Amino acid sequence: MHPMALHMVLPAHLPFLSPEVLRLLEVHVKKWMHFQRWGLPRRVEESLRQLMPNPPLYYQPGNDQPVSFNLNNTSQVSLHRSETISLQTWCSCVAGQPIQTFWVSEWSTMNPEQRHHCQQTPNPMALALPSPALKALSGPHPQSGGQDNDSGSDLQQKYSQLFCGLPSLHSESLVATFMGSQGLPKIENVPKPPLKDPFLFNDLSFPQLLPKTSPQSAPPSSPLSPNWVSPSDHQRAQINVPFLTLAEYEALEWHLLQRQLQLQWGWPAALQRSQHTQCLMQHEPCGKAQSPETTTASQTGKSISVLTRELLFFPEHARKLLEFHIQKQSIRHRWGLPQKIQQSIQLLLTSTDQQTVSSSSTALANVSIPQPVALEANGACDVLSPIAAPVSIPRPHLLTQVKAILQSHIDSKCGQIHQGKIPACVHRSWDCRISGVLAVAPFPCIPESQFLVLQTASDPDLHHKVMPWMPTALDQQQQALPGTVTEHPKLLRVLSVEAIEKLETTLRHKHLAFLSGLPALYYVALPRALAPAVTSQSVITEMEPSPVEIPAEPLI
């Protein structure tokens, strides 16, 4: 087993941890033990070699000179006392173990004697804590009720968690919890470790682990290892890996928080773009990490909140509709109504009656419609608060009145048609078509009693009257057909009797098809099917001279 492996000692009962937290801690400890035994993956090691050409240093157990991890028998590298070292360096120095190479690929170069000596680990606590912290925990503490031995052993078990890969904030909370539960003074005024480098190994500075006890209360005890050399205070405060700067660490942390919130809550794309533009425009250096919960706009002062848990019940299509609605509203607030809509509104205003406009001119009001305005140079990017320019458009109630007037006109015309009243203008159009050359296009939806209407078409009073009509029964029409056909004086000059009969039959069938709701194709198919039967008797009459030739196709 690798000599730097840390053994996790958990007490039998942890009342302040839930089962879920315990499972997460177990998984984390397993990963940490695997890392301590097998090291980093080979690709990660290669990338670290590029970032760290000079690996971290160990201290020799016998002297006070720093040496490299990749220690050979003939070469040693001396650096200043202020060089930062990792947690594994402390663990090896406390246990008094020989030097071990840092890279996984160089573990095979270790001597058999060193490997045999590395397997003899004296105490797991010596790997996890330095000698001063170990003395402070193992020594007697001022307790009430004579619980010195029990509290000391309990603290030894609990403090073994602190350097097993727990997050730094969780380790700090454990420190405060353990010291408060055991009657030790809490750490309050101890300065926090500098955030210049990330906690890659999740370690704490050793002065935070030492309880605030007076030197007289804790009697001196001999160190566990006689070869251990106490490092300086500056080296104690910098037990970090020095290949990430503060800006890179904060940028990575902010990106990670953003991705986690995006995956958990599912922000709409519009909010993501607005927050991204606000971050770019308001914070040009981007040196400060913002809070992931709210992003404050620079001009309006309104905060754009992150979607909360109450919106998780939204289905996917509802989220898409909401995003589309937000995009439309943002475009409308920024650029105003489209140009075609504005032109149609102006045409509507100019096409209305002058009297209506004059009577309703007092009801018009100026409604502020935002127009495209150039952004200022200070980086304002709030798309929901543009500078508005006044444009004169009517209020919605005027459009409602126009719609109501048009609807009432359509309803009145439909009512007249259902009642059988034909306007006089329709009669005039029929008269003009019939009096000219033979109309080649039939009249759609004309009742079967049209021939009665045509008889009175020459009456000039019909131009100023409304002509009611009611369709006659089919049996009455069949009785009237064998008899004499009423002739119109104008129709006699242009139509023969057979043409009039054919026209009446076509109109009758079309009217019946219209009443029965048949499609338009039936209007064409039925007259074509009945055309030979209707015109069979008129073949002989075609030989005689007639003023107008009867067309072969029915009048459609």
Curated annotation (Swiss-Prot):
Superkingdom classification of source: Eukaryota
InterPro entries reported in the protein's UniProt record: SPATA31
Skewed-composition ranges (Polar residues): 144-154
Residue segments, region Disordered: 133-154, 210-231
Protein family: Belongs to the SPATA31 family.
PANTHER family, alphabetized: ACROSOME-SPECIFIC PROTEIN, PROTEIN SPATA31F1-RELATED
Protein name listed in UniProt: Putative protein SPATA31F2P
Organism: Homo sapiens (Human)
